[in-house]
């Protein structure tokens, strides 16, 4: 299972990747990465809730 810290680092990396795609004006890559960002953010949210609830 991925830890909170690992998922946070994944999200940060994806955001950097999105920034690079934005600089290249690559809309297809931007869309693909934005989906990955949304999925990672959702995982991070769940890990945060689990942490708060002591799981």
Descriptions of predicted regions:
Residues 3-55:
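Short, charge-rich amphipathic interface segments used for partner binding and complex assembly
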């Amino acid at each position: 299972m991925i830890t909170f810290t690992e998922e946070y680092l994944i999200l940060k990396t994806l955001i950097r990747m999105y920034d690079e795609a934005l600089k290249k004006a690559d809309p297809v890559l931007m869309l693909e990465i934005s989906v990955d960002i949304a999925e990672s953010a959702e995982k991070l949210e769940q890990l945060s809730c689990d942490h708060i609830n002591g799981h």
